């Protein structure tokens, strides 16, 4: 059995880790970094870039550079948060045929799981390069407050990337695993406050020693899947746009290139202001009007940034309060506070959290890597490499069905430990009703329409009977990934209907299979592209070396030699400009053969010169050696 890797699939950055010889190793990518930007770009020459290379070219290619796609995963196009996102990003968010939010690049519609799969493929390749063997299994993390559709979509992304997703694990739970595995024995309760690039989670977790096992039990979880560092960036970008407009009268919002430069500058300034009190945002030639080029130069203080985002930080406190209440605990019951996610490096966030919980957060947990480390530990638990860990997670939202009058009737309450199974008997609403529709919902509202619809299915052929007589048993079964399976059974006939909840939206099995095939085809295309690039480089190098040899040969090269070589050189240069690898290799061989006689002639002459070196020169060389020895002053060494 191969290694099970742990992947933190983040909104802004992703990270991959593996348990090796009892220690977790965060694996560096091809660029030498331990985290990879979750950015994908499609270039004009048909190449797909992932990570840092994609981020580097974003300024010149904003419409085809996709970032923060995780915020769209498992979401419907008409959701308010999606409509808000459309205003914020330079790329195109469109409505798919099934009503989901997809993206459109170069006229092609793509599902968010398909885009996220590109990041997962990069993580998979990073691990394979390090391990030197294929990797097919992974544990992938999701925000604790992700609903069923979002979890299912993340699992789909893994499949498209060629990974068997052994477990979907909640990010705060993974961070607690990373923190708690090597801590002293004894029970303690921790808060994991996870403010990442696009999502916010808070979990109350009890870490206990039970019969020699580390038991991690999630008591409650809460959050906001559309609140994160991206929103902090947007506040700063809006401020910079307003300041520039006041000064120059120009609104940069209509200029995608300028906005992309501003986005990068705002992100950099935000990071700098975590360690300095003031920074300059300086963008020369950001735009131009009739009077000439315009430069943006704005001083931003830490206090100014804090005033811009204070309400966002405060928005994280209510979920903390709710999670504590759901767990039946007070602030005084919390032993440790763990901060996860890059945005928690902001001093205002740290201060606000410390004030609410009455204690400073721990500083020994790496906020960028803890989640991937925890995922790797969970992977090792599933592989049987780690024996003494038990993870008890919860479902973040209440699950139920729509009943008479458009009411949501809960079957499994939020914060129920998973896996779990619950059955309840319902009946018909009308006399002689022959079928019932089971409408599965997720959320906390009493009105069914206010909750997230996860799917519908019918139980038909119910024998005629007065309303209220038939007994229909509805069973909800949540697996360890937090993914729901629902069945309905007519107790009189034993007839049963069941589904794995595929969101009323979501990708069909056929779509996933097609995307898997596309990904495999792209991998083959990428391999061919790499081989072609390598052949071109070799061809260029051979052209350069051959021209250098002709120059050095001077008169030793006959006109006939030169003509033969020049002809072969011209053919190779033409081949290098084309797309045929076999042609390039053939022309390289031809050039090698054409230049071999001249190379042999030059080599023979050089060897002859070495043998014919005058005796006087050799004697002089010997004299030089003696002089050097004579001049050496050993006492002063």
UniProtKB/Swiss-Prot annotation:
This is Chaperone protein DnaK. Acts as a chaperone. InterPro entries: ATPase_NBD, Chaperone_DnaK, Heat_shock_70_CS, HSP70_C_sf, HSP70_peptide-bd_sf, Hsp_70_fam. Keywords: ATP-binding, Chaperone, Nucleotide-binding, Phosphoprotein, Stress response. One of its GO terms (cellular component) is cytosol. The modification Phosphothreonine is found at residue 199. Belongs to the heat shock protein 70 family. The keyword Transcription regulation does not apply. Pfam families: HSP70 (PF00012). Residues 603-637 are annotated as: Disordered. The gene is dnaK. It comes from Pseudomonas aeruginosa (strain ATCC 15692 / DSM 22644 / CIP 104116 / JCM 14847 / LMG 12228 / 1C / PRS 101 / PAO1). It comes from the Bacteria. One of its GO terms (biological process) is type IV pilus-dependent motility.
